[in-house]
Amino acid sequence: MESVNAKDRHGHTPLIAAAKEGQKDFVLDLLHRGADLTSTSAKGKTALHYAAANGHSEIAEMLIKKGSDVDARDSAGHTPLMLAAIYGCNKTIQVLLDGGASPSLTTSAATTAAMYAQNNNHPLAAAMLKKAERAKHHTA
């Protein structure tokens, strides 16, 4: 199990690297071999953070189904949903929301995922996230 969770100089495990690069079959193989979903890079990012930031929605869905924390925060306070919003990865945003990610979480600067989407010129992503925030408030 040690080698499946070995880290490179950036703190990337094979699972993080595969999630970042969109290598779905490799991610699946690593998960079957017991790769650690909670392992983080030097920047505090999990494999789900990297899948979300790079728009790899199928990988994000696999990681969530295996129990990855959808609201995990990196060292800057970003969740996978925030990273997907920054890069306008609409399909991944929907996968994260469906997986239980909270659209109303904020960074220490009080920035939500919807604000990141808006600030980075991703109006559809911003609209999706604002709608999800409203839905959460009505069910809370």
Segments the model singles out, each with a brief description of its role:
Residues 25-26, 58-59, 91-92, 124-125:
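Conserved ankyrin/ankyrin-like repeat signature
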